[in-house]
Amino acid sequence: MCKEIYDLIAKELYRQQSTIELIASENFTSKAVMLAQGSILTNKYAEGYINKRYYGGCEFIDEVESLAIDKVKKLFKCNYANVQPHSGSQANQAVFLALLKPGDTILAMDLNSGGHLTHGAKPNLSGKFFNAVHYCVNKDSYLIDYNEVEMLAQQHKPKLIIVGYSAYSRKINFATFKEIADKVGAYLLADIAHIAGLVATEYHSSPIPYAHVVTSTTHKTLRGPRGGLILTNDESISKKINSAVFPGMQGGPLMHVIAAKAIAFSEALMPQYKEYINQVMLNAKVLAKLLQDRGYNILTGGTDNHMLLVDLRGKNITGQEAEYLLDAAGITCNKQVMPFDTTSPTITSGIRLGTPACTTRGFKENDFITVGKYIADILDNIAIIKSAKKNEDITITEIENSLDSVITHTKQHVQELCNSFPIYTN
């Protein structure tokens, strides 16, 4: 291996091992998944579908893809699946290509309320090719406002309604979305990229009986390789989806990744996986309560899934400051725009925290109480320093210098905790 790359991988392994990973969209996949991704399957071109390839020598490739499809259909209890999308974004784009025409109207959640870029955000292809209308969460409860969704649907008559989010911590009523979609004759797309693991284990209701199409990533709570998938119970839609993925969106599928997806689906079908998802949710609730008890505003008052959103507007702390200084202390998270946020997306007014990765390492409730204390200690000290400066401008570097001893002390404790939960042995 190239020494430079080897050294960088070693450094990244050390970073992952020695830090607390709280980015809600990240996880630690199994060695089996990684072995499949690094296998000789990466050598094979396989444009097309099972028994309909444009290259020879695909007899074993067909079996690999067939296994992945069978396992994901069993996992989500659906009739049709496409496992070829390279990402969740491309899965969504394939749905648009299959069901929409340029200029059609789509209705989805506003980015600041927790929606995703691929749901019609202006910088994204979905916002450039389609007329995107967005609904928001309720200004008081920060919950989905189903009345507003229906009002906008009746007003704009979208061709497609999207449900599913990247920053929403409560359960989704797919049945209500189905009723709204039916009233205006719209397709319903459920993007379950974040909650796929909860849906697979029935800790969250499934959109399969309600949505025309379901998309997801295969990493995040599913703990698989980075990739996408598309599910449906409608045969005619499945044919359109297949054509949209290939030849519409992609060329040759990544067979080494599809093999890794099959392994991840197999792992998710095991009883231990349901126990894992339950622990993910317990850990998220404990972390949310600890931060609430320390005086921090958790949007919606808690969480029903794997993530929580910490609104820092009342503490005079930006998401950028929190992310940077927590990272300095060995705690990785991401700054997050809050509903009705007036700051830049590069600054933000809060952070998003997730429990899947550390739960994979073996963290339980008591460990997350400890983690929550570390987070609150850092945030408390940021607030104290900024309060002392009153209205004076202060840079993140200046805050970091003032917090040097606190950051150093916290980082030592973080590393001690992480050493008790190795990611990969041997």
Swiss-Prot record:
Gene Ontology process terms (BP): glycine biosynthetic process from serine; tetrahydrofolate interconversion
Catalyses: (6R)-5,10-methylene-5,6,7,8-tetrahydrofolate + glycine + H2O = (6S)-5,6,7,8-tetrahydrofolate + L-serine
Enzyme Commission code: 2.1.2.1
Cofactor(s) of this protein: pyridoxal 5'-phosphate
Binding site residues for (6S)-5,6,7,8-tetrahydrofolate: 111, 115-117
Annotated GO CC locations: cytosol
* Cited PROSITE patterns: SHMT (PS00096)
The pathway entry for this protein reads as: One-carbon metabolism; tetrahydrofolate interconversion; Amino-acid biosynthesis; glycine biosynthesis; glycine from L-serine: step 1/1
Q: Which cell locations does it reside in?
A: Cytoplasm
Q: What class of enzyme is it?
A: transferase
> Which key words are in the record?
Amino-acid biosynthesis, Cytoplasm, One-carbon metabolism, Pyridoxal phosphate, Transferase
Q: Which domain of life is it from?
A: Bacteria
Oligomeric state and interaction partners are given as: Homodimer.
Spell out the protein name for this chain.
Serine hydroxymethyltransferase
Gene name, Swiss-Prot/TrEMBL:
glyA
